[in-house]
Amino acid sequence: MSRYLLEIGVEEIPSDYIEATKSQLKDKFKKLIDDNKLTVDEIRVESTPRRFVVFLENINASESDELISIKGPSVAIAYDENGNPNKPLLGFLRGQRAELSDVVVKDFKGSDYIFIEKKEESKSVKEVLRENVYDLVKSISFNRSMRWGARSIRWARPIRYFLSILDDKVLDFDAEGISVGNITKGHRSLGSDHIEISTIDEYEDKLRENYVILSSKERRDLIIRGLNKVNMEKGGEFMKDEDLLREVVNIVEYPTVLAGDIDEKYLELPKEVIITPMKDHQRYFPVLDEKTGNLLPYFLLVRNGDDNHSENVISGNKKVLVARLEDAKFFYDIDSSRPLESHVEELKNLTFFEGLGNMYQKTQRLMDLTAKYQQQLNLGEDIKEDLKRAAYLSKADLVTKMVIEFTELEGTMGRIYAKESNESDRVATAIEEQYLPNSAGAALPKSITGIVLSIADKIDSIVGLYAKERYVTGSQDPFALRRRALGFINIILKNNIDAVSYTH
C-alpha cells in the first residue's frame, strides 16, 4: 500500500473558484484510479487560497494482469475458400504482433469474428501517477482561466510549483518547466517560502509551523470560535451568513478574529445600508443585539495572520469602513431628499438592453403585464392600483445615488425609499420582492403584489433577451436567464399558478 501527496502551489485564487476546483480534483483522481484498475482507501482534497492538496491514502495497483480481447475482421472475410488467411486477417495479426495460433473466434452481434486475447500488464502506482497527474491538473476547468509563459496549460491563476511525494520520495513528472519536488511555501508574510518536506506525515505540521492551517474545516471552526468569543465580550451575536463565512474561510490561511467599533451615528442609517458595505465590500461580520436584533456599533473581521499589531490592523480596517459608511450616508441623504417617484423619468436615460428600450419603457411593459395577470389570476380589485403603482416605481431606485454605488441594494433601497415616500406596504414590498429569488434556494416573494411583479419582470426579461438571441449556452449565462427562469418556475409551483402569458 502506498501514500501519495500532491500540492498544487498557485498564486492567490478567487474564493468562489475553490470549492468547485476541489470537487473536480477529487472526481478526476477517482476516475484515474478506476480507469487504471488501482484501489484507494481515501481521496482527501484540501485547499487554501494559495494551494490545492490531494492525499491518496493506501493506493495500490492491481495484483493480477488483465486479459483483454481485441476484435479483428469477421470470419467471413478472414479466410479464403481453402481456409487460408486473407489479407484482412494477416494485417490484423501483424498489427497485433500475433500468430495464427493466437486466433480465437467469438460471436459478435450475431456473426463470428476474429479475436486476439492478450494479457495487459497492470501499471504500477508510480507509473500511473507519473504519466497522468499533470494532464489531470490541466483538465480542471474554470469559468475564466489564463495562460502564463509558453505553456499549454490554462488555469484560474498561474501554478508556481508542484509538491509531489509518493511513499516519502519525490515523484517527478513533466510539468512544462514548472518545478516538481518536495518544497512547499508557508504563509505569504509570516512563513518561510522554502519548506522542505521529507515525509508525508510531517507535511501538515510543517505548514502549521509556518502559519498555514490546511484544513478548511479547521479554519472554519477557528473562525466561528473567534466570532463567538468576541461576541461574548461585546454582548451581541454575529450575523449568521453562510456565504460570507465560506468566502472568508477560503481567503485566509491562518485566521484570527478581531473586533472594531464604529460611531453610533451610522446606526441611524437603514440597517441594509450599513450591512452591505460591511459584508459585501469588506467581508466583515456585523454584530446584532441578541434581544432586539438591532445592529450594534461593532464589526468583526477575520485577519489572515496572527494577532500581532492587531490595533493597527483594526484601525486600518475601521478607516476603510468609515469611508464607505460616509459615502453611504452622503448618498442616502441625497436620495432621501426626493420622493422615489421623481426618479422615474430618469429611467429614460438608462438602457435596459439594446433593441429592448430603456428602463422607463420596461416599467411600462410591467404595468401592462401586471394588469393582465391581475385579471388572469382573478385577483381582487383592491390590489389593482397597488400593482400598477409598484410596476411604475419598480426600477426607480436604479438611478439613485445609493444603488449606483451599491448595486447589491437594488430593490432593497426601492422599498426603503418607497416607505419614506409614503407609498403603501404592498407597493414597497413588491419593489423589493420583484428580484426574488436572487440565487438558488433563496427566499421567494411572499406578498401577492411581489409575486405578480416578480413573474412579470422575469417573463419580460426572458422573452426580450431570447428575442435578441441572448441564449444560455452551457456554463455561460451572462444575463442570468437560467436563474430568472428557475425563479419563475419556483414561484409558479409554490403558489399553484396555472398559467400566465406574455403578449401586448
For the regions a protein language model found, what residue spans apply to each?
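Amphipathic alpha-helical "coupling" segments that flank catalytic cores
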Residues: M1-Y502
